[in-house]
Structures are given as C-alpha cells and as structure tokens.
C-alpha cells in the first residue's frame, strides 16, 4: 500500500480529517472483501484451504460479524463521489461470501499487510505507505548517486495546502488513519510516528504547563493511544531535530533510486 496522502491531496482532503478516515475505512474494506473473494475462488479451484482453516474464525463465521450487520452509509459527499461506479459490497454480499468461504474455504491464511515502501514510492511518483509526506521537497542522500530531490507527488497550487508535513500533524490523526485500515487488514502495518524534538505549541494537550521538548512520556501516551485504537504494530519513531536532521529514519544502504 502506498500513495494514500497523494490520494488525499489530489482530492483536496486534509490528512486525518473525518472524510480522509472514511475514505481509508471504505477503501480497505473493499480490499479485504475482494481479496477474500479471490482467495475463496482459488480454494475452490484447487480444492485446498490453508492449514487449520476449520479452526479459524473464517470457518466459524465470527470474522464476518463486523460486516454483516449494516450496509455502508457514506457520511461525506466527496467520498461518495470518489467511489462512484465502484461496487461497494452490501451486508448481503458479505453474507454470501461468508457462506461461500464456510463451504469452500480460503487458500491464503494471510493476505494483507502494509510495508513502508520508502524507496519504491519515489519510483512510482507517489507518497510512501499510508503516512503523510515529511517535506514538500524531500532531499535524499544516495551513497552511489549523491543527492536527489523529490517534490511531493502531483504538487501544485491546488494540492499544496493539503500536503502538510507529518512532523506538523498530531500523531493521533496518523494513528486514526492507520487504525481505519487496520480493521480490514489481517497482518501488521508499518505505522511510523513522526515527532519533532521540540513539539509544536498546543498540539498535545498533555504538554500544557510542561516543556515542549519531546519526552518518552509523549511516546508512551501515543503508543497507548495506538494500542487502544486497535493498531497491531508501530514500525519506527522518526525525530526531526532543531538542527533540521532526521533521526531514526529507515536509511537502507543497499537501496538506491
């Protein structure tokens, strides 16, 4: 998965806004549904399911309870327009898929995960993974080719207001986006926390009356927030220092663009 922030910017949605969370929720619900249907089709064709399928919640049907109670009701007109012409499964569709999987099985035990996609996103001219961009124009130091500069994908006067740096966004909003996807993903996601060493004034209410310096307490509060919301993993914590350095970035020596 990559390009989510680019999708938001090109459709003039702010990262972490209610409509961006709604889009993420529905998009990954669709991804879940259609990968389940594809895995069920393969299981039928090959007459084989993953090991211990009969002991899984897919077989008992418990897995589908969250999808079979109500139909999707769009809250945002913009999100509704984005999905116009795309088949959004109804609760009846989910019930039919639930029955088909109970009868014929699933070929894949694991289907979905979100990788960091740091380098590959540049090649594809889109934003990395599900997280926000870090700069409007990003500088990368490649060991073999020297410095390379990458503007935010589809950067224009229209998209610029929606390309806010990850370091200037409340990390709870980033977690909200990831959790909206996590509901539909059976494995973990490369959820990265982007923190300034000097936190923006007023961003986190628990800092009121305290130093704005980032501390381990701040990280613990955010980790607990992510856990309570249902995130399965946190990948990295990247820190932007007062010297304009990034610490903790996933710099792979063997990866070049």
Predicted segment positions?
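Core structural elements
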Residues: 1-12, 184
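Catalytic alpha/beta core of large soluble enzyme barrels
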Residues: 64, 80-92, 99-246, 251-257
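Catalytic phosphate/nucleotide-handling subdomain of diverse soluble enzymes
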Residues: 7-11, 15-38, 125-150
């Amino acid at each position: 998965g990559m390009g989510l922030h680019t999708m938001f910017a090109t459709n003039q949605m702010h990262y972490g806004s209610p409509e961006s969370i709604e889009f993420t929720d529905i998009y990954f619900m669709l991804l879940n549904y259609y990968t389940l249907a594809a895995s069920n089709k393969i299981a039928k064709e090959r007459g084989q399911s993953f090991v211990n399928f009969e002991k899984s919640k897919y077989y008992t049907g418990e897995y589908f309870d969250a999808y079979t109670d109500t139909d999707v009701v769009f809250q945002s007109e913009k999100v509704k327009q984005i999905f116009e012409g795309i088949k959004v499964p109804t609760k009846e569709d989910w019930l039919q898929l639930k029955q088909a999987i109970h009868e014929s099985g699933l070929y894949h035990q694991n289907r979905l995960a979100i990788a960091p996609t740091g380098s590959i996103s540049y090649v594809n001219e889109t934003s990395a993974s599900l997280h926000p961009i870090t700069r409007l124009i990003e500088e990368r130091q490649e060991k073999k080719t020297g410095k390379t500069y990458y503007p935010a994908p589809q950067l224009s006067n229209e998209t610029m207001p929606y390309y806010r740096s990850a370091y200037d966004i409340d990390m709870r909003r980033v977690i909200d986006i990831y959790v909206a996807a996590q509901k539909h993903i059976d494995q973990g996601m490369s959820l990265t926390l982007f923190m300034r060493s000097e936190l923006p004034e007023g961003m986190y209410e628990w800092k009121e009356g305290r130093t704005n310096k980032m501390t381990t307490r701040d990280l613990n509060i955010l980790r607990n927030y992510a856990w309570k919301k249902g995130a399965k993993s946190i990948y990295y914590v990247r820190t932007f220092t007062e010297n304009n350095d990034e610490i903790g970035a996933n710099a792979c020596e063997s990866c070049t663009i």
